[in-house]
Amino acid sequence: MELDFGHFDERDKASRNMRGSRMNGLPSPTHSAHCSFYRTRTLQALSNEKKAKKVRFYRNGDRYFKGIVYAVSSDRFRSFDALLADLTRSLSDNINLPQGVRYIYTIDGSRKIGSMDELEEGESYVCSSDNFFKKVEYTKNVNPNWSVNVKTSANMKAPQSLASSNSAQARENKDFVRPKLVTIIRSGVKPRKAVRVLLNKKTAHSFEQVLTDITEAIKLETGVVKKLYTLDGKQVTCLHDFFGDDDVFIACGPEKFRYAQDDFSLDENECRVMKGNPSAAAGPKASPTPQKTSAKSPGPMRRSKSPADSGNDQDANGTSSSQLSTPKSKQSPISTPTSPGSLRKHKVDLYLPLSLDDSDSLGDSM
């Protein structure tokens, strides 16, 4: 006699399934709400990682560059070096980035960026070739509406008021600015390097900007030019001090400057042409000037024809010999202090001590 126990197997299978669900306390992992939440969180993190960050990059020390906007993502740049290489192709020039982009700083220079994860959405950064940040108002030439997080209504009013205040301040402060050539001498052991900087309304916008230009020109071993002194030992504190009576300034870096009288005195190498220097008084360019004046002015010609000399000149070669002998015999009235030649030499003597690098070329041109 055979009995059918199939219904007992189905009942045991159902009880085993119920027992397993009670032991876990959760339904099957494939159908649980926890698993769906985990999958959503993973996809969200993955999308955030691949989402591009919109940032702006500037050139170090370039106050006229409006910046370039980059969409930085891990898909576009596999590494931080790849980002630096791409920025080099986009921003490199011979003036501000001569060696390409090697460093990235925050907009205030307080921190150096070392990876793409440190870049933040909507922020601005400065690219540099060397490990030296130049403080410049990079964002003043940029329209702030490029960021999606900034309201447009407030930004449309702010630039107008800022532009009007800047223009009024510029008109008020630029009255004393005039074209002037100043000499900057690097502090340190003599002989010292000196450069000449032209200041006018296009180059002298502010005191900080002039210090930046002097830093680029003088190239101190200690870095940035922090202080400037006149030859009298007075510190230059504002833009107006450049347009006073002083034309020569001593540039000092971050190091502590020790006042010494020898630091404010120019040696023989730094002042090659002085008032009592005979090489400046009788240069090779002094002879053409008397010839031109003697040929055009009839006064010296009449004085040279004395009765004794005129007879000798007529016996030898006639009138032409007296004309040729006139420049040699009449150099004394031409070198008088009131003549144009002496005034021209006097200006060179006063001006050339300020030029240390190209005094010879200026003497020839003048």
Curated annotation (Swiss-Prot):
Changing T336A: No effect on overall phosphorylation. The keyword Magnesium does not apply. One of its GO terms (biological process) is intracellular signal transduction. Residues 53-139, 180-263 form the Doublecortin domain. Phosphorylation by MARK1, MARK2 and PKA regulates its ability to bind microtubules. Phosphorylation at Ser-265 and Ser-297 seems to occur only in neonatal brain, the levels falling precipitously by postnatal day 21. Keywords: Cell projection, Cytoplasm, Developmental protein, Differentiation, Microtubule, Neurogenesis, Phosphoprotein, Repeat, Ubl conjugation. CDD domains: DCX1_DCX (cd16112), DCX2 (cd17069). Its main location: cytoplasm. This is Neuronal migration protein doublecortin. It comes from Mus musculus.
